[in-house]
Design a protein with these regions (language model features):
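NAD(P)+-binding Rossmann beta1-loop-alpha1 motif at the extreme N-terminus of oxidoreductases
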Residues: 1-63, 89, 125
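Amphipathic alpha-helical hairpins
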Residues: 15, 60, 66, 70-73, ...
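Rossmann-fold NAD(P) dinucleotide-binding segment
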Residues: 51-115
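Rossmann-fold dinucleotide-binding core
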Residues: 97-176
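Helical "substrate-binding/catalytic lid" subdomain
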Residues: 166-195
Length: 195
């Protein structure tokens, strides 16, 4: 049974970690202790309160945090988990962050011998709840293949796109297209109502 640490129990992360709790040994971490306590009551799993003191080896560490600063804090800061990981652990990040931070995290992962997959998600809260997210993965093919079954716990469509900055750019491009489309549709509706 794979040992998984899931970091970030927000709107997306909470149900994603819930899917993983079926058939895996899941431990969760969240800055807000209340959310983590609620997750433990709802699903089968364990809780940790300090990432910098990890001493139990995990097969996978999965993060879904809010922004660049959050990702840096949980990985490479003095409070982060990277310094305690070994080369067998695959770190999968689902956060929507900048290419700059992904490049920095990947550089540190290589230096420390950590397998890192940059894997943004799309599909919204409903996709997370229903286990039907689309996942665009950047990183090493063998790490992706090793992680495929874990990703399928909450992802309906999982594809590797190659380099780290490629997938981040794809996610940002897709988000921008959606915004432009929505704005255009809204403007068209208002023009129609005016006429």
């Amino acid at each position: 049974m794979p040992k998984i640490l899931f970091i970030g129990l927000g709107t997306m992360g909470y149900p994603m970690a819930g899917h993983l709790s079926h058939g895996n040994d899941v431990t969760v971490y969240n800055r807000s202790r209340l959310k983590a306590d609620n997750w433990i009551k709802e699903y089968k799993g364990n809780l940790i309160t300090n990432l910098s003191e990890l001493n139990d080896p995990f097969d996978y560490i999965i993060s879904c945090v809010g922004n660049d600063n959050d990702l840096e804090e949980i990985t490479i800061s003095s409070f982060g988990c990277f310094k305690n990981l070994n080369s067998e652990t695959v770190f999968i990040d689902h956060s929507t962050v900048s290419p700059k931070i992904v490049k920095l995290i990947n550089k540190e992962a290589i230096k420390l011998g950590i397998q890192f997959l940059d894997a943004p998600i799309s599909g919204g809260e409903a996709g997370a709840i229903n286990g039907a997210l689309s996942i665009m993965v950047g990183g090493n093919l063998s790490s992706f293949e090793k992680s495929r079954e874990v990703l399928q716990s909450y992802g309906k469509k999982n594809q590797i796109y190659g380099g780290f900055r490629i997938r981040t750019t794809n996610k940002n491009y897709k988000s921008n297209l959606y915004c432009w489309f929505s704005a255009g549709l809204s403007r068209s509706s208002s023009l129609h109502e005016e006429n």
